[in-house]
UniProtKB/Swiss-Prot annotation:
GO biological process, one term: rRNA processing
Lineage summary: Eukaryota, Fungi, Dikarya, Ascomycota, Pezizomycotina
Name of the protein in its database record: ATP-dependent RNA helicase DBP3
Domain notes: The Q motif is unique to and characteristic of the DEAD box family of RNA helicases and controls ATP binding and hydrolysis.
Domain Helicase C-terminal: start-end pairs: 335-484
Catalytic function, reaction form: ATP + H2O = ADP + phosphate + H(+)
Pfam families per the UniProt record, alphabetical: DEAD, Helicase_C
Motif range (Q motif): 100-127
InterPro entries, per the entry: DEAD/DEAH_box_helicase_dom (IPR011545), Helicase_ATP-bd (IPR014001), Helicase_C-like (IPR001650), P-loop_NTPase (IPR027417), RNA-helicase_DEAD-box_CS (IPR000629)
Binding site for ATP: 143-150
Signal peptide coordinates: none
Domain spans labelled Helicase ATP-binding: 130-306
Functional note: ATP-dependent RNA helicase required for 60S ribosomal subunit synthesis. Involved in efficient pre-rRNA processing, predominantly at site A3, which is necessary for the normal formation of 25S and 5.8S rRNAs.
Species, as recorded: Coccidioides immitis (strain RS) (Valley fever fungus)
Length: 515
C-alpha cells in the first residue's frame, strides 16, 4: 500500500458526499472507551476506562464506521508500516484502526467536519490519534513539526466539548490547550477557529504582551482556551479564570516548554485542573527525552504513546535537502547575498526565504544589510513588540514580504506555508534547535531546502550535525568532517559529565532474596 498523502491544498479531493450528509441527531450512541484492534468488527471496552470513579469515561463516545471496520487487517498493518507508525499501549493490544480517510470519521450531528473539505486525507498523526482521542484515552504523540498535530488534538477537543451536557459546560472553559509561545498560540487559534465557528463553540487565545482586559472579555464565554503558561498563571492568580471544569487538557510542544523553563509553571497550572480520573490529557512533542517522559508520567493516566518515525534520536525531515557550507566568518555576508539572489524569485508567494540568526543584535544587523541591497525584508525577534512581530509574520505569510530574518523565537511550531528555503546564517546553540529551524520548510508533504553557513566557531556541534545529516540520508561535506564526528556527552549544570539521566517512569525490577 502506498504511503498516504499528507494534507496539502495541491492534491485536493473534495470530501465524499456521505461525510457531508452526516447530520443525524443523536448519532453518537456508542460505548465509551473504545479502541479498535485486530479483527475488530465492533466496539470493545478499554480496561481501566470504565472505572466508576472515572467520570470522563461516560463522556467519551466512539464507534468506528462499518467501512473502517470492514478494512482487511493487512491494509491497516501496511498503513502503519509504510508511515513508520509505532504504538505503545499499556492497557490494551497496541493494534488499532487508524482513520485513514475523512469518510471514516465518526458520525456527527453538526457541521464540525465541513472545513476538512480543503484537505485530501488525514496525516498519519491525525489518522492514528483520532480514534484514541475520540475514545477518551490519554495520548502522547511524538511527531515532527509540520505533521498536522494541531488538528490531531483540535478536532477531538471540539467534538468532546459538543458531547458535554449543559451542566458540564456551565463551568468554562471545558478544554485547555497550553503552548510555549504566543505565535504558536495564535496559530492554533486561527486553525481551530474555522472549525469552532462552524459549530458555535467559543474559543479564546491568551498570551503575554497583549492587553489583559480584552483577553478577560474573550475568555468569559469560551469553552476552549488556548494559552501560554505565563499569562495563564496570571489569570489564575487574579481569579480571572477558573480551570475546575477542564475535562480536556492539551500540552502542545511539551519538549519546547521544558526547554523554555516552563515545567514549574505547568505543574502549578495543572494543580487547578481536575485529576487524571476526571480529565483527558493529550501531549504532543517533537522529541522524546527523559524530561518529557517524566512530565508525561505525572500528567497522564495509562497513556497510549504514538510515534511517527524514530524518536530515539532527534531526526530531520527527509524531505528537506540539507546543505552545509563551511566558510570563514568574514565570508558570510557576501555568501548570503549570493544565495538570496540565486533563490529569490521576484517575491512570489511560493519563494519565501526564512533567514535565521542566533542573537537579536545580529538579526537586526542582517535585516538592515539585506534591506540595503534592495531586498524587501522584515524581521522578528525578542526586542520587537507583539504588534510588530505579528505584522512581520503576516506580511511574510501573505507574500508581500518574501524575506524574513528571525531568531529562534520563530523556530518552533509556526506553520508558514510554502517556505522555499531556510538559511542559517549562524548555527544555533543546540542540534535540536537546528532541526526545529529547518523544519519551517518541507511541511505538509512538500519538499524543502535548508542551507547552513558553518564556521570553526561552531565545531563543537559538528558531530551532532553530521549524525543528523547521515540519518536523513544527506551528503556530509569533507570540510565538515575535518572538525570531527564525535558527539560530546551532555553535562549537567551542577554535576558535569558524571551526571546520568534516569528514566523515572520505568518500574524497578523485583529482587528476591533466598532465606
Amino acid at each position: 500500500m502506498a504511503k498516504r498523502p499528507l494534507q496539502t491544498e495541491a492534491n485536493v479531493e473534495r470530501l465524499p458526499s456521505e461525510l457531508k450528509r452526516r447530520k443525524k441527531k443523536n448519532s453518537l450512541k456508542v460505548t465509551p472507551g473504545t479502541v479498535i484492534g485486530q479483527n475488530s468488527k465492533s466496539r470493545r471496552n478499554v480496561p481501566g476506562m470504565d472505572d466508576g470513579n472515572d467520570k470522563r469515561a461516560s463522556d467519551s463516545r466512539y464507534l468506528p464506521t462499518p467501512e473502517l471496520s470492514a478494512l482487511p487487517q493487512s491494509t491497516i498493518d501496511e498503513y502503519l508500516s509504510s508511515n513508520s507508525i509505532h504504538i505503545a499501549d499499556p492497557s490494551t493490544d497496541p493494534s488499532l484502526r487508524p482513520i485513514t480517510s475523512f469518510s471514516f470519521l465518526p458520525e456527527s450531528s453538526n457541521d464540525l467536519y465541513l472545513p476538512l473539505e480543503k484537505f485530501s486525507s488525514p496525516t498519519p498523526i491525525q489518522a492514528v490519534s483520532w480514534p484514541l482521542a475520540f475514545a477518551g484515552r490519554d495520548l502522547i504523540g511524538v511527531a515532527e513539526t509540520g505533521s498536522g498535530k494541531t488538528l490531531a488534538f483540535g478536532l477531538p477537543c471540539l467534538r468532546r466539548v459538543l458531547e458535554l451536557n449543559n451542566s458540564e459546560t456551565s463551568c468554562k472553559p471545558c478544554a485547555l490547550i497550553i503552548t510555549p509561545t504566543r505565535e504558536l498560540a495564535v496559530q492554533i487559534y486561527d486553525q481551530l477557529l474555522r472549525f469552532s465557528s462552524a459549530v458555535d463553540v467559543g474559543i479564546a487565545c491568551i498570551y503575554g504582551g497583549s492587553p489583559k482586559d480584552h483577553q478577560r472579555r474573550e475568555i468569559r464565554n469560551a469553552s476552549v482556551v488556548i494559552a501560554t503558561p505565563g499569562r495563564l498563571k496570571d489569570f489564575q492568580a487574579d481569579q480571572t479564570i477558573n480551570l475546575s471544569g477542564v475535562k480536556y487538557l492539551v500540552l502542545d510542544e511539551a519538549d519546547r516548554m521544558l526547554d523554555k523553563g516552563f515545567e514549574q509553571d505547568i505543574q502549578d497550572i495543572v494543580k487547578g485542573i481536575p485529576s487524571t480520573q476526571k480529565r483527558q490529557t493529550i501531549m504532543f512533542t517533537a522529541t522524546w527525552p527523559i524530561g518529557v517522559r517524566n512530565l508525561a508520567a505525572s500528567f497522564t493516566k495509562n497513556p497510549v504513546t504514538v510515534t511517527i518515525g524514530d524518536s530515539s534520536d532527534i531526526r530531520a525531515n527527509k524531505r528537506i535537502k540539507q546543505m552545509v557550507e563551511v566558510l570563514q566568518p568574514y565570508e558570510k555576508d557576501s555568501r548570503l547575498l549570493e544565495l538570496l539572489r540565486r533563490y529569490q524569485d521576484g517575491g512570489k508567494n511560493n519563494h519565501r526565504i526564512l533567514v535565521f540568526c542566533l542573537y537579536k543584535k545580529e538579526a537586526m544587523r542582517v535585516e538592515r544589510f539585506i534591506g540595503s541591497k534592495g531586498f524587501k525584508v522584515a524581521g522578528i525577534h525578542g526586542d520587537m513588540s507583539q504588534t510588530e512581530r505579528f505584522r512581520s509574520l503576516e506580511a511574510f505569510k501573505s507574500g508581500s514580504i518574501s524575506l524574513l530574518v528571525a531568531t529562534d523565537v520563530a523556530a518552533r511550531g509556526l506553520d508558514i506555508p510554502a517556505v522555499k528555503l531556510v538559511l542559517n546564517v549562524t548555527f544555533p546553540l543546540t542540534i535540536e534547535d537546528y532541526v526545529h529551524r529547518i523544519g519551517r520548510t518541507g511541511r505538509a508533504g512538500a519538499e524543502g531546502l535548508a542551507i547552513t553557513l558553518f564556521t570553526e566557531r561552531d565545531k563543537a556541534l559538528s558531530g551532532p550535525l553530521i549524525n543528523v545529516l547521515r540519518a536523513a540520508d544527506q551528503d556530509v561535506p569533507e570540510s565538515l568532517l575535518k572538525f570531527g564526528a564525535t558527539v560530546k556527552k551532555k553535562q549537567h549544570e551542577s554535576y558535569g559529565a558524571f551526571f546520568r539521566e534516569m528514566d523515572t517512569t520505568k518500574v524497578a525490577s523485583r529482587i528476591k532474596f533466598e532465606d
